[in-house]
Amino acid sequence: MKALILVGGYGTRLRPLTLSTPKPLVDFCNKPILLHQVEALAAAGVDHVILAVSYMSQVLEKEMKAQEQRLGIRISMSHEEEPLGTAGPLALARDLLSETADPFFVLNSDVICDFPFQAMVQFHRHHGQEGSILVTKVEEPSKYGVVVCEADTGRIHRFVEKPQVFVSNKINAGMYILSPAVLQRIQLQPTSIEKEVFPIMAKEGQLYAMELQGFWMDIGQPKDFLTGMCLFLQSLRQKQPERLCSGPGIVGNVLVDPSARIGQNCSIGPNVSLGPGVVVEDGVCIRRCTVLRDARIRSHSWLESCIVGWRCRVGQWVRMENVTVLGEDVIVNDELYLNGASVLPHKSIGESVPEPRIIM
């Protein structure tokens, strides 16, 4: 079985992290976002993953070729010369996707969840039509485009954009299974699968919705990235608690790479991820943060709701909060306060940032 993952965007919502690394390779809970998806696909029996790429494609190709042998699957690149939306990439990869009559997965690369791929295959084969989409329930459907479907069969009747009166609380979760016949519906041009292809399929009775059980998050922007981390760590607590850290100073769900080092009298957690080579010095407090590879947090600093990029250096007695994001290789000098700062890569911060802003 095959899968196409849409990884061609510029990752603008996740800047400054994506200024130096393509978004699919940004580490989420100590593993690239893309690798969470590819490993789950391989475990579900997918043997060929196609990446619809454009921005920084050479970096992606190098990394995924290294993973190809480890996972024992084929990974191909489909290069977009111009942005093709969410349906155009399927037309571009038509020859690869239609090599067999088997249905194939299509994934949005921003999504993190429990990835129920085997259940999706069973659901798709059971109803026997052209398309299946995964849907998830939300508390405020008026903020989203919602899916209106039959409760018992899942057959989709229509899509409603940001409804002001309640019609459904289910939204598109960004994961699909499609039969090769769908490729005949798509031209090689910029096209939205959600707005131009799916509504027609729904009218023809060819599209069904399967409801996702468990957590789901689009982690394409920093505040949602942190929320997604919290949900992922809670899922680990329930399913693989042995992967989480415990011991003196560890509070709640905390994921620590074996090569990371934590000093004395620290308070780490709840909801913290520390990547490979991270050093946390004595007396540091970290809550609801992710700290990426080879970063160092010096003594007595306090971090809450932050993303600390690769190889950053945070000084002593620093306070950072309110979705502060440090790009790669940022230095924060001692005794500073950063409130909602977004700092571009390779910057040195010498004064406090009391109000949210971008540091260029």
UniProtKB/Swiss-Prot annotation:
It is an enzyme of class 2 (transferase). GDP-alpha-D-mannose binds at D110, D218. Changing R287E: Disrupts interaction with other GMPPB molecules but not with GMPPA. The keyword Zinc does not apply. Changing I219T: In MDDGC14; reduces catalytic activity. It catalyses: alpha-D-mannose 1-phosphate + GTP + H(+) = GDP-alpha-D-mannose + diphosphate. This is Mannose-1-phosphate guanylyltransferase catalytic subunit beta. The gene is GMPPB.
